[in-house]
């Protein structure tokens, strides 16, 4: 894949091919790490059911904490990539923006991971600790040939707008500078400003799905706009696993991301 030409580590390249479509060179990731931060939300109470639905819908990978492997591994159905999330923090913590590392790259390898991810809140009072974690873990990932996804979110006392193009661009560039292979960050809400974010980041960017949207059309249009602006995929949780038709919405996303389908065409994948 051309966008990974700068990566010379063969192990990383092999694993990246498991979570990116070789033809479109893009990815659809379904994060299911919300149980740690927010508790047993609807849609991920039974992770096997959700994993099966998104796999059947064509998703390239699921993302979650190491418990996802134990409680979400199916042993049947369509294969799907596995990304182990290394960061944790809760909504009921005194500092919800603080994320700590709760597992290792070596543990992720033992669990069969195709990539690892960690979360950095850029602008949080504890952000310097998360920067240190990202920089050090990127070195370990390089040693083991493990792709690293950095979730770079502008959040903190000085952040007035988490979709501000300047702060999103800064967050994305920061993640790439500290060694991430893939950046997950907010879509700015506008294709023109997001193009500038992409231009300023040497690593491919996957957009976050964001809060649950009012309509499927609104959500899919965001995905469409982001892909045309240079995004290399989408990582969406609640807009997928809390949908009435999990398989259908996953398939609709895949139609747009991998086939450049129009929103109206993609909506036909949703049956409920």
Swiss-Prot record:
SUPFAM superfamilies according to UniProt: Aldolase
Enzyme Commission identifier(s): 2.2.1.10
A GO molecular-function annotation: hydro-lyase activity
InterPro entries xrefs: ADH_synthase, Aldolase_TIM, DeoC/FbaB/LacD_aldolase, DeoC/FbaB_aldolase, FbaB-like
Keywords annotated in UniProt: Amino-acid biosynthesis, Aromatic amino acid biosynthesis, Schiff base, Transferase
Positions of the catalytic residues: 33, 153, 184
Catalytic activity entry: 1-deoxy-D-threo-hexo-2,5-diulose 6-phosphate + L-aspartate 4-semialdehyde = 2,3-dioxopropyl phosphate + 2-amino-2,3,7-trideoxy-D-lyxo-hept-6-ulosonate
Similarity field: Belongs to the DeoC/FbaB aldolase family. ADHS subfamily.
Subunit text: Homodecamer.
Listed name of the protein: 2-amino-3,7-dideoxy-D-threo-hept-6-ulosonate synthase
Organism: Methanococcus maripaludis (strain C5 / ATCC BAA-1333)
């Amino acid at each position: 894949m051309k966008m990974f030409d700068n990566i010379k580590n063969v192990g990383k390249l092999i694993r990246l091919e498991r979570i990116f479509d070789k033809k479109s060179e893009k990815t659809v990731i379904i994060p299911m790490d919300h149980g740690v931060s927010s508790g047993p939300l609807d849609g991920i109470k039974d992770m096997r059911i959700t994993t099966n639905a998104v796999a059947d819908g064509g998703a390239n990978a699921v993302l979650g904490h190491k418990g996802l492997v134990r409680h979400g591994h199916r042993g049947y159905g369509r294969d799907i990539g596995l990304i182990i999330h290394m960061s944790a923090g809760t909504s009921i913590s005194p500092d919800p923006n603080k994320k700590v590392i709760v597992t290792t790259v070596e543990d992720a390898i033992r669990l069969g991971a195709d990539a690892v991810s960690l979360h950095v809140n850029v602008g949080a009072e504890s952000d310097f600790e998360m920067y240190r974690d990202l920089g050090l873990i990127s070195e370990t990932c390089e040693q083991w040939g493990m792709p690293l996804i950095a979730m770079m979110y502008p959040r903190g006392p000085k952040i007035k707008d988490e979709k501000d193009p300047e702060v999103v661009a800064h967050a994305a560039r920061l993640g790439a500078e500290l060694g991430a292979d893939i950046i997950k960050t907010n879509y700015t809400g506008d294709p023109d400003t997001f193009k500038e974010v992409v231009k300023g980041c040497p690593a491919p960017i996957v957009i976050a799905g964001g809060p649950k949207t009012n309509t499927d059309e609104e959500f899919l249009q965001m995905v469409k706009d982001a892909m045309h602006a240079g995004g290399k995929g989408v990582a969406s949780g609640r807009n997928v696993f809390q949908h009435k038709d999990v398989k259908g919405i996953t398939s609709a996303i895949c139609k747009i991301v991998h086939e450049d389908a129009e929103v109206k065409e993609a909506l036909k994948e949703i049956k409920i």
